[in-house]
Amino acid sequence: MNISQNPSPNFTYFSDENFINPFMDNNDFSNLMFFDIDEGGNNGLIEEEISSPTSIVSSETFTGESGGSGSATTLSKKESTNRGSKESDQTKETGHRVAFRTRSKIDVMDDGFKWRKYGKKSVKNNINKRNYYKCSSEGCSVKKRVERDGDDAAYVITTYEGVHNHESLSNVYYNEMVLSYDHDNWNQHSLLRS
């Protein structure tokens, strides 16, 4: 994809070179790539340098419990048991993982989906706890982790695992609003007034 042909100036395409190892320690975010979002709405990719903070995005396909698909390279993992039985050659379903690093005063930001908190745990080398969420839509197995950056508490790291099998609530609301639009009497609709 040629960036100059990109119709959306806020979208950034990343190639396969930015994929990360899904089996790395969950506490090691130093190798992740994050998308940096300022409170003022200034979005952008910041090159990874020693003198600047890491603020890059990463998207990958990995083997895991959550369902979904991605357009990235699939990593396979063979499971084995140590109970004296034969090794299992089962390959788990593939999923998709994306991490965002956002400058924010609040921990959990509205991303258009409904989430149910199912856990919280202390993270090594970080005074802030990591929160775990599952998508509350029936049949959707997407999970997200939310935690404050250990180096700079002004940033929140949100990691999504999986792909939603449904539309976000904001898309449903927007589609209903557009469907109720009357081309002849657009001033009469309270949803479309500013």
From Swiss-Prot:
GO MF term set: DNA-binding transcription factor activity; sequence-specific DNA binding
Protein name from the UniProt record: Probable WRKY transcription factor 51
UniProt DNA-binding region: 104-169
Deletion consequences: No visible phenotype under normal growth conditions.
Superkingdom: Eukaryota
Family: Belongs to the WRKY group II-c family.
Biased composition (Basic and acidic residues): 76-96
Upper taxonomic lineage: Eukaryota, Viridiplantae, Streptophyta, Embryophyta, Tracheophyta
Keyword GTP-binding tagged: no
Role noted for this protein: Transcription factor. Interacts specifically with the W box (5'-(T)TGAC[CT]-3'), a frequently occurring elicitor-responsive cis-acting element. Involved in defense responses. May act as positive regulator of salicylic acid (SA)-mediated signaling and negative regulator of jasmonic acid (JA)-mediated signaling.
SUPFAM superfamilies: WRKY DNA-binding domain (SSF118290)
UniProt subunit comment: Interacts with CAMBP25/VQ15.
PANTHER family per UniProt: WRKY TRANSCRIPTION FACTOR 51-RELATED, WRKY TRANSCRIPTION FACTOR PROTEIN 1-RELATED
The encoding gene: WRKY51
Main localization, broad class: nucleus
Gene Ontology biological-process entries: defense response to bacterium; defense response to fungus; jasmonic acid mediated signaling pathway
